[in-house]
Regions:
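Residues within the DNA-recognition helix of helix-turn-helix
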Residues: 72-75
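C-terminal flanking helix
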Residues: 77-84
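Hydrophobic positions on the alpha-helical face of helix-turn-helix-like DNA-binding modules
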Residues: 58-59, 69
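Helix-turn-helix DNA-binding elements, focusing on the entry/boundary residues of the two helices
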Residues: 55
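Helix-turn-helix DNA-binding motif, specifically the short coil turn and the N-cap/start of the second
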Residues: 65-66
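Short amphipathic alpha helix immediately N-terminal
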Residues: 39-50
Length: 136
């Protein structure tokens, strides 16, 4: 499994809790492919990875066994990893994000070196890139 470094403010996503890259990847997979899961798989996966509930807590909330929760989470993870392997959407998203950040840094350097209209154009381009990055 490839671990992607998703550059986000982790505290914004987690309410201040520390989050591993693996959990961030799982959250991104759910964002990209969650609608392709069954409702039960999506709910169990979301409660486990995004809400940080234990298997017992999820089982109680969903009215199924801990084993059922575990199986739903594993099936969801497997299905989303299979879809990602076939489509590569998350990988391409990350590659585009990295490329946009590099362009933004290049534009920042260019803006520092130039004056006049070229400087204004570089600053405008940086703002547009920031907007694209913020949208995800």
């Amino acid at each position: 499994m490839v671990v992607y470094s998703i550059a986000v403010n982790e505290k914004d996503l987690t309410g201040g809790r520390a989050v591993s890259e693996g959990r961030l990847r799982q959250a991104m997979l759910l964002d990209f492919y969650g609608e392709l899961l069954t409702e039960k798989q999506r709910l169990c996966f979301d409660l486990h990875y995004n809400e940080d509930l234990s298997l017992s807590e999820i089982a109680e909330q969903c009215g199924i066994s801990r084993q059922g929760v575990w199986e739903n989470i594993r099936r969801a993870e497997g299905a989303m990893e299979d879809i990602e392997a076939k489509t590569g959407l998350l990988r391409r998203f990350e590659e585009n994000r990295v490329a946009l950040e590099k362009i933004r840094e290049d534009m920042r350097s260019l803006a520092a070196m130039t004056g006049g209209q070229a400087h204004e154009t570089a600053v405008k381009a940086m703002k547009e890139i920031d907007t694209v990055i913020a949208r995800g």
